[in-house]
C-alpha cells in the first residue's frame, strides 16, 4: 500500500485547529505529531513548520503528553539545528513556559480548594457547644484534617510538578553537547535549579545533578562530533562553572550536603581544566560553601582550613581592589567588618579542632588508614593546598598573619586561655563568660560542642600529669560550663571511654567509688600508636599540651635514651681513644666525601642534563602529537563541514525545487479556483480540481456563459413585457395629477423666493451699517497713519540708498569678475583648441610619415623580389644548359651503342622458320620477342635498306640488363618510368624511327604480324584526338626536327666511362 500523501504544514495546522474546535484535541495532537515525525517534513521550510511545532507543544502540555512532545522536539531539533537555531530556542522556551504556567495554575487551584475546605469547616454549625469535640471528630482530625493540604497538593499540584520536571529533563537532553544551543542549555539548567529550590524537590535535584554530570562526561567523550562543545574554550568552561556554582548554592540551601560535596568536586575538576583563573567572587562562594559542608560533616580541621583560605581570598581581593588590579564586579564585597568576621571564624574554627584523634577506634587497620589518607588528599586538593593542614600549621598561619589583632576580643581571650596559659583548675571560670557570648551568637553557637571536647581533652591530659587518682565529682566541678551548655556526668564518662578506646587517654574509672585512676604502668605504651590514627589531630605534635611534669611511664620509656646519652658523655670525657677514633672516623668520612664530591657533582649535572634532554624530547614528542591530533581534528572538522555544507546545499536545492513545484501547483490551483469562482460553480469539489485541465475549464466556462446568456435573455424578455404594461398605467394616472402638482410647486417656489429675498436684503443692510461704522472709526486714524508712513519712508530712504549703492558696487564687482572669468575661459578654450589642432596635425604628419615609410618598404620588398626572380631565372638557364649538355652526351652514347649493335648484327644466326610454314597460331607478343625502333634503325643502317619480307628476320640478341636510373637522371617532370624488359616503344620512339628512315613506310617483316587485340576491330583513328595523328602531320609538313634528346626513360645499359665521353 503506498504511503499517504504528504500534506503541507499550513493544511495540517488548519486541520488541527478544526479538530480542536470540535473537541478532538487528542486527534489533533496525533496529527501534528505524525506530521513532525514524518521523513518528508525534513525538506519543509522551517518558517512554515514552526507554527505546527508551537501548536503541538501547547496541546502536549494541555493533555500531559510528555513522551509525544519529547519525540517531536527531538525530531524538530534534528531538522532545524543546521539552518535556524533560534526557532529551536523559541519552541523549547515555549514548552517550559507552558509547563511552568500549568504548575502555577495548579498551585493556585490547590490553594483555592484548601481555603474553601477551611472555610467550610470553619463555618459549619455546631449542634452542641458543650460537646463540640467528640472522639470521632478528634480521630478524623488526627487522621485526615491535618493532611488535607498534602492530599490536595498530591492530587492537583504533584502531577504538574512531575510534568514540569520531565520537561526540564527533556529539554536538557535535547540541548546537551551542542555548541550552538549552549546558552539555552545553561539557562535551562539554572531554571531547573530554581524549580528544585522553589518546590524543595530534593530527589529531583539529585537526579538533575547526576544528569548534568553525565552530560559533561559525554561531552568529553564525544568531543569530535559536529557542533560538540569544547571544554577547553574559556567561555564555555566559565558558563559550566557558573552552573556548578548555582548547583552548589541550591544544594546548600536544600541541606543536601553529599550533593554539595560532589558539586564541589565537579567545580574543582572544571577549575583544573580552566586555563584562566576563576573570579574571586566565585572562589569566595566556593570556600564559603566548603566551610558549611565541612562543619556539617564535623571535619573541623578542614573546616578551619577552608575558613583560612576564605580569609586569604578576601584579603587578596581587598588588596587588588585597592591597587586597581581587579574589577569590582569580579571581587566579593570586602569591608573591615567582613575581614574581622572572617578572622574571628578562622581563629574560632582553629580552636575547635580536636586535640586528640577523631578516628572511631584505636585499632585502625591499614586499609582504613590508606582510605583516610586518600580522603585527606582529596580534601587537600579541593582546598588548593600543597599539603594536608594540621592544627599547629593553622595556628602558625594565624600568628604569622596577625589574625588575633583583627579577631573579636572574646575570641582573642579564648585563644589565650586555651593555647597560651591553660590552667585546669581555673579554666571553666575563665571560659564561662566567653562561652556565654559565643553561644549567644547563632553562627558561633555551632562551635560550643567541639570547644568543650578540646577543653575536656586538655583538662584530662594535664590532670594525668599531676594526679594518679582523682574523684569524678572533682572533675565534674572543674568542667562547669554555663547553661545551656552544661556537661553532665554521663557526657564526661562517654568522653573518657572514647579517649581510652582511641588510645589517647589511659584512665580507669571505678563506678563504685566514683574515682578516676590514671594509668601508672611504667611499661605502658598507650601513646605508641601508628601515625594513621593521628590524622586530623594534634596529639603527636610537640608542644600541643603544656607539660607540667613527666609521668612515671614517660620516665621509664625514656630511660634507655637518657642512659645512652650519659654513657656517651662519660666516654667522651674519660677515654681519649674514643674521641680520637670518633675524630678519625669523621675525618675519613669528610675525606671520602671531599674526594667523591666533585665526581658526584659531575654525575648529578650529567644526570640533570640527561633528564632535561629527556623532558625536552618528551615535550617535543607530546607537542608533535598534539599538533598532529589538532591537525587531524581540523581536517576532520573541515571534511565534516564540507560534507555538511554539501548536504545542506543539496537539501536546500531539493527543497527549493519542491517549493517551486508546489508554488506552481498552488498558483495553478488558485487560478482554477478563481476561474471557477468567477463562473460561480460551487458544485465542484476540491478533490475534482486536480482532474480539471484548461480544455475542461474552457468547456465549463462556455456552457456557463451559454446558460447565463439564455437566462438573461429570458429575464429581459419577461421584465420588458412587464415594464411596458406598468409604465403605460403609471403615465395614464400621472396625466390626471400633473396640473394640480404644477400649481402647488409654483406656490412653494414663490414663497421660498420671497423668504430668501427678505433674508438677503436684511443681511446686506446690516453689513452696510457695520462697514460705515468701521469707516468712521478708521477715518480718525488716517492722520496718524499718514504721519507714521512719512516718517517711516524718510527713515527707510537712507537705508535703501545705502543698500542700493552697495548692490550696485557688488553688481559692478560681479560683472568685472564674470568678464574676467569669461576672458580666461575663452583664452583657455583657445589654448585647448590650438593644442588639439597641434596634436591632430602631429598625428596626421606621423601617419603620413608612416605611410611613406611603408611605401618605401614595399618598393624595397618588390626590388628584392625582382632581384630574387632574376637570380632564379639565371639558375634555371644554367640548369637548362647543364641539362642540354647532359642530353648531348647521352645522344652521343646512344649513337655509339647503335654502332656497336649494328656491328653485332652482322654475325650470322640460326634462321627462324617463317610463320606461314609452321602452320601454328600467331605468336604471343611475349617480352623480348619484338624488336625496338633502335634495333630496327641499327638493322637498317647495317643492311643499307629495309629488309625484305621474304628474307629471314635477323636474330635478336638477348636483351641487355635494365639500366638503373639514379634520381639525378630522372626527367624534369613526373615520376621516373619503370624500366621493364621488352616494353612496347612509345609513339615518340616510333616517330623518331620514321624520321630517321626518311619517311618510308616500315619494312615488311616475315615475322609475326603486329599485335592486335582480338575482338576489337579496326584500330582507333586518332587523327582528330590531338594525341598522335595531328602531331604526325605537323611533323611531316614542318621542317626537319632536331635530333632527339634522351628522354631519361629505360634503355640499354651504358657504361659509365661511355656516358662521360
Swiss-Prot record:
Keywords: Coiled coil, Cytoplasm, Initiation factor, Protein biosynthesis, RNA-binding. It comes from the Eukaryota. GO terms for cellular component: cytoplasmic stress granule; eukaryotic 43S preinitiation complex; eukaryotic 48S preinitiation complex; eukaryotic translation initiation factor 3 complex, eIF3e; eukaryotic translation initiation factor 3 complex, eIF3m; multi-eIF complex. InterPro entries: EIF3A, eIF3a_PCI_TPR-like, PCI_dom. The lineage of its organism: Eukaryota, Fungi, Dikarya, Ascomycota, Pezizomycotina. PROSITE patterns: PCI. The gene is TIF32. Residues 114-126 have a biased composition (Polar residues). GO terms for molecular function: mRNA binding; translation initiation factor activity. Component of the eukaryotic translation initiation factor 3 (eIF-3) complex. It holds the Pfam family PCI. One of its GO terms (biological process) is translation reinitiation. This is Eukaryotic translation initiation factor 3 subunit A. RNA-binding component of the eukaryotic translation initiation factor 3 (eIF-3) complex, which is involved in protein synthesis of a specialized repertoire of mRNAs and, together with other initiation factors, stimulates binding of mRNA and methionyl-tRNAi to the 40S ribosome. The eIF-3 complex specifically targets and initiates translation of a subset of mRNAs involved in cell proliferation. Residues 950-962, 1000-1011 have a biased composition (Pro residues). It is found in: Cytoplasm. Residues 114-133, 828-1061 are annotated as: Disordered. Residues 609-724, 789-906 form a coiled coil. Residues 339-523 form the PCI domain. Residues 828-901 have a biased composition (Basic and acidic residues). PANTHER family: EUKARYOTIC TRANSLATION INITIATION FACTOR 3 SUBUNIT A (PTHR14005:SF0), EUKARYOTIC TRANSLATION INITIATION FACTOR 3, THETA SUBUNIT (PTHR14005). It comes from Chaetomium globosum (strain ATCC 6205 / CBS 148.51 / DSM 1962 / NBRC 6347 / NRRL 1970). Belongs to the eIF-3 subunit A family.
Amino acid at each position: 500500500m503506498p504511503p499517504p500523501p504528504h500534506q503541507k504544514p499550513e493544511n495540517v495546522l488548519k486541520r488541527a485547529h478544526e479538530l480542536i474546535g470540535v473537541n478532538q484535541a487528542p486527534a489533533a495532537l496525533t496529527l501534528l505529531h505524525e506530521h513532525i515525525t514524518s521523513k518528508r517534513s525534513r525538506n519543509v521550510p522551517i518558517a512554515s513548520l514552526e507554527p505546527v511545532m508551537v501548536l503541538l507543544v501547547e496541546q502536549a502540555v494541555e493533555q500531559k503528553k510528555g513522551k509525544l512532545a519529547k519525540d517531536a522536539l527531538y525530531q524538530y531539533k534534528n531538522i532545524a539545528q543546521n539552518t535556524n537555531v533560534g526557532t529551536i530556542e523559541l519552541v523549547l522556551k515555549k514548552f517550559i513556559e507552558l509547563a511552568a504556567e500549568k504548575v502555577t495554575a495548579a498551585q493556585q487551584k490547590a490553594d483555592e480548594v484548601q481555603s474553601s475546605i477551611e472555610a467550610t469547616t470553619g463555618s459549619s454549625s455546631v449542634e452542641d457547644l458543650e460537646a463540640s469535640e467528640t472522639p470521632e471528630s478528634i480521630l478524623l482530625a488526627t487522621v485526615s484534617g491535618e493532611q488535607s493540604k498534602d492530599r490536595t497538593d498530591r492530587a492537583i499540584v504533584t502531577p504538574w510538578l512531575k510534568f514540569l520536571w520531565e520537561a526540564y529533563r527533556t529539554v536538557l537532553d535535547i540541548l546537551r553537547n551542542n555548541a550552538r544551543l549552549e546558552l539555552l542549555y545553561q539557562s535551562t539548567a539554572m531554571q531547573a535549579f530554581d524549580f528544585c529550590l522553589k518546590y524543595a524537590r530534593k530527589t529531583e535535584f539529585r537526579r538533575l545533578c547526576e544528569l548534568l554530570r553525565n552530560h559533561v562526561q559525554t561531552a568529553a567523550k564525544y568531543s569530535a562530533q559536529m557542533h560538540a562543545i569544547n571544554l577547553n574554550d574559556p567561555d564555555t568552561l566559565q558558563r559550566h562553572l557558573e552552573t556548578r556554582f548555582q548547583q552548589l548554592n541550591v544544594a546548600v540551601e536544600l541541606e543536601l550536603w553529599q550533593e554539595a560535596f560532589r558539586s564541589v568536586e565537579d567545580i574543582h575538576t572544571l577549575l583544573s581544566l580552566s586555563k584562566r583563573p576563576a573570579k574571586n567572587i566565585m572562589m569566595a562562594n566556593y570556600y564559603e560553601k566548603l566551610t558549611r559542608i565541612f562543619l556539617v560533616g564535623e571535619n573541623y580541621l578542614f573546616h578551619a582550613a577552608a575558613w583560612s583560605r576564605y580569609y586569604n581570598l578576601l584579603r587578596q581581593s581587598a588588596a587588588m581592589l585597592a591597587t586597581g588590579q581587579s574589577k569590582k564586579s569580579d571581587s566579593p564585597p570586602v569591608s573591615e567588618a567582613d575581614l574581622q568576621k572572617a578572622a574571628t571564624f578562622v581563629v574560632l574554627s582553629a580552636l575547635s579542632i580536636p586535640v586528640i584523634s577523631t578516628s572511631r577506634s584505636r585499632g585502625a587497620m591499614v586499609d582504613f588508614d590508606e582510605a583516610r589518607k586518600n580522603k585527606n588528599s582529596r580534601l587537600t586538593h579541593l582546598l588548593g593546598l600543597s599539603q594536608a593542614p594540621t592544627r599547629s600549621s593553622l595556628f602558625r598561619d594565624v600568628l604569622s598573619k596577625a589574625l588575633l589583632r583583627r579577631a573579636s576580643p572574646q575570641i582573642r581571650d579564648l585563644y589565650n586561655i586555651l593555647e597560651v596559659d591553660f590552667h585546669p583548675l581555673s579554666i571553666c571560670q575563665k571560659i564561662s563568660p566567653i562561652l556565654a557570648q559565643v553561644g549567644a551568637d547563632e553562627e558561633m553557637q555551632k562551635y560550643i560542642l567541639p570547644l568543650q571536647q578540646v577543653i575536656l581533652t586538655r583538662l584530662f591530659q594535664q590532670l594525668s600529669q599531676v594526679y594518679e587518682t582523682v574523684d569524678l565529682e572533682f572533675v565534674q566541678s572543674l568542667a562547669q560550663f554555663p547553661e545551656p551548655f552544661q556537661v553532665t556526668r554521663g557526657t564526661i564518662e562517654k568522653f573518657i571511654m572514647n579517649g581510652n578506646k582511641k588510645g589517647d587517654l589511659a584512665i580507669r574509672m571505678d563506678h563504685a567509688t566514683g574515682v578516676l585512676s590514671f594509668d601508672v604502668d611504667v611499661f605502658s605504651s598507650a601513646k605508641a600508636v601508628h601515625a594513621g590514627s593521628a590524622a586530623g589531630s594534634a596529639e603527636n605534635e610537640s608542644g600541643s599540651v603544656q607539660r607540667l611534669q613527666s609521668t612515671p611511664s614517660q620516665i621509664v620509656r625514656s630511660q634507655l635514651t637518657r642512659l645512652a646519652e650519659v654513657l656517651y658523655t662519660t666516654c667522651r670525657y674519660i677515654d681519649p681513644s674514643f674521641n680520637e677514633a670518633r675524630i678519625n672516623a669523621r675525618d675519613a668520612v669528610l675525606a671520602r666525601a671531599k674526594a667523591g664530591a666533585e665526581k658526584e657533582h659531575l654525575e648529578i649535572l650529567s644526570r640533570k642534563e640527561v633528564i632535561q634532554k629527556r623532558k625536552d624530547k618528551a615535550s617535543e614528542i607530546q607537542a608533535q602529537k598534539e599538533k598532529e591530533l589538532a591537525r587531524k581534528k581540523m581536517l576532520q572538522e573541515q571534511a565534516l563541514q564540507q560534507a555538511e555544507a554539501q548536504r545542506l546545499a543539496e537539501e536546500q536545492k531539493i527543497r527549493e525545487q519542491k517549493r517551486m513545484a508546489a508554488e506552481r501547483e498552488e498558483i495553478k490551483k488558485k487560478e482554477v479556483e478563481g476561474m471557477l469562482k468567477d463562473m460561480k460553480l460551487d458544485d465542484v469539489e476540491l478533490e475534482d480540481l486536480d482532474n480539471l485541465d484548461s480544455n475542461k475549464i474552457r468547456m465549463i466556462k462556455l456552457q456557463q456563459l451559454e446558460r447565463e446568456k439564455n437566462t438573461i435573455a429570458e429575464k429581459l424578455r419577461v421584465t420588458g413585457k412587464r415594464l411596458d404594461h406598468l409604465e403605460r398605467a403609471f403615465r395614464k394616472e400621472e396625466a390626471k395629477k400633473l396640473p394640480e402638482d404644477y400649481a402647488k410647486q409654483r406656490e412653494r417656489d414663490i414663497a421660498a423666493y420671497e423668504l430668501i429675498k427678505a433674508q438677503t436684503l436684511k443681511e446686506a443692510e446690516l453689513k452696510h451699517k457695520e462697514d460705515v461704522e468701521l469707516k468712521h472709526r478708521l477715518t480718525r486714524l488716517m492722520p496718524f497713519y499718514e504721519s507714521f508712513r512719512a516718517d517711516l519712508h524718510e527713515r527707510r530712504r537712507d537705508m535703501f540708498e545705502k543698500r542700493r549703492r552697495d548692490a550696485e558696487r557688488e553688481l559692478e564687482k560681479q560683472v568685472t569678475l564674470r568678464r574676467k572669468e569669461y576672458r580666461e575661459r575663452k583664452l583657455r578654450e583657445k589654448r585647448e583648441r590650438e593644442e588639439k589642432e597641434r596634436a591632430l596635425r602631429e598625428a596626421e604628419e606621423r601617419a603620413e610619415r608612416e605611410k611613406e615609410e611603408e611605401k618605401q618598404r614595399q618598393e624595397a620588398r618588390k626590388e628584392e623580389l625582382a632581384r630574387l626572380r632574376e637570380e632564379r631565372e639565371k639558375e634555371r638557364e644554367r640548369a637548362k644548359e647543364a641539362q642540354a649538355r647532359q642530353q648531348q652526351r647521352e645522344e652521343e652514347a646512344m649513337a655509339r651503342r647503335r654502332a656497336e649493335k649494328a656491328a653485332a648484327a652482322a654475325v650470322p644466326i640460326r634462321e627462324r622458320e617463317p610463320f606461314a610454314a609452321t602452320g601454328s597460331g600467331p605468336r604471343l607478343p611475349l617480352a623480348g620477342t619484338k624488336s625496338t625502333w633502335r634495333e630496327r634503325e641499327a638493322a637498317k643502317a647495317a643492311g643499307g635498306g629495309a629488309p625484305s619480307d621474304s628474307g629471314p628476320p635477323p636474330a635478336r640478341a638477348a636483351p641487355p640488363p635494365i639500366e638503373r636510373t639514379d634520381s639525378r637522371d630522372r626527367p624534369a617532370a613526373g615520376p621516373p618510368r619503370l624500366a621493364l624488359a621488352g616494353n612496347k616503344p612509345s609513339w615518340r620512339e616510333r616517330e623518331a624511327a620514321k624520321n630517321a628512315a626518311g619517311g618510308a613506310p616500315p619494312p615488311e617483316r616475315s615475322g609475326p604480324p603486329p599485335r592486335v587485340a582480338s575482338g576489337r576491330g579496326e584500330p582507333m583513328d586518332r587523327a582528330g584526338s590531338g594525341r598522335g595523328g595531328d602531331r604526325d602531320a605537323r611533323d611531316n609538313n614542318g621542317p626537319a626536327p632536331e635530333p632527339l634528346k634522351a628522354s631519361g626513360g629505360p634503355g640499354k645499359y651504358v657504361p659509365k666511362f661511355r656516358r662521360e665521353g
